[in-house]
Every structure is written in C-alpha cells, then in structure tokens.
C-alpha cells in the first residue's frame, strides 16, 4: 500500500534532501503542518488500518532536480472506514511515496 504526494507551496519550513540518495527513509513519528487552502485526496483500504495511520516516508527526487525540500514533521490521522482528504503543505515540488509500517 503506497501513498503518493506531490505539490508546491511557498509556505512553511522544510528540510533539503540531496538527490544523490534516490530514496531516503525517515522513520518515527513525524508531523506535517498544513494550510487549509491546499488539499490532497488520500484513499486506501481502511480495514488494514487503525484509527491512527502512521507512515515511514520515502522521498524520491524529481528528474533534473539536485535536491528536494521536504516539509517536516509529518503526521495524519485517518478515522476507520473513511477515505481521508488532507491538506498538504509543501515548500517546493516534492514527490513523496510512503509505505505502511
């Protein structure tokens, strides 16, 4: 089960991730502060999840980019039996793929 996120925002703090490392895993509980004006739809089979959905992000650099800005920290909560619509807070173009753990 994978989550794909992409977006652009001029707001917020972020960390730079060097593209020489194509995939960087950030473990633990991370929090993402989100503005109310930008949203992304997140859907998954909620039967496999508890009320708190935690992710271990894996960041992939877009082609031609030397680095990506990753907003940290990151967290979201998905109620059981629902598909989540969450605002996304991204400093620059970022492509995020997260897997369940």
Curated annotation (Swiss-Prot):
Q: What is its main location?
A: plastid
Q: Which UniProt keywords apply?
A: Chloroplast, Plastid
User: Where does it reside?
Assistant: Plastid, Chloroplast
Q: Name one GO cellular component term.
A: chloroplast
Keyword Chloroplast included in the entry's annotation: yes
By what name is this protein known? Uncharacterized 11.4 kDa protein in trnR-chlB intergenic region
